Amino acid sequence: MEKRKFIIQVEFAEKNFCCGLYDEAIGGAVLSTGKTFEELKKGFEDSLKFHIEGNMERGDNLPEDVAKGEYDLEYVLDVPALLRDAERFTTLSALSQICGINKKQLSHYATGEKKARPDKREKIIEGLHEIGRQALAYS
């Protein structure tokens, strides 16, 4: 049987990454924020574990796989969150050259001033992957 997977939508709002999950399988909702994506993930995973443990202690009837922590989390970042997290290892200028999206447009996406269409999001992700491949080529 395939492991249960929870899809976690990550956004960048104000100066923080934020995410949440509402699912009957966990018996409610868990929210988290963080200054960095890594901080957000750690906080969310700790909160989810705490939430599930609390529900189990109260006698809530959760699915066995959830109660045992046998599930996967998949984080899906919106475009502002993608671009803000990518600032750790690249610049908008470098990404612009690779993916062919104007730097100013990328800046508008990063601030949330403009919303990127799904095809632009894919171009950004492909550009980030290409930057990673190029970095791996160094020995």
Regions found by a protein language model. Give the residues of each.
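Short, charged, surface-exposed hinge/linker loops at domain edges
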Residues: 1-5, 46-104, 108-110, 114, ...
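DNA-binding alpha-helical recognition surfaces that contact promoter or target DNA
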Residues: 42, 108, 126
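DNA major-groove recognition helix of helix-turn-helix/homeodomain DNA-binding modules
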Residues: 118-137
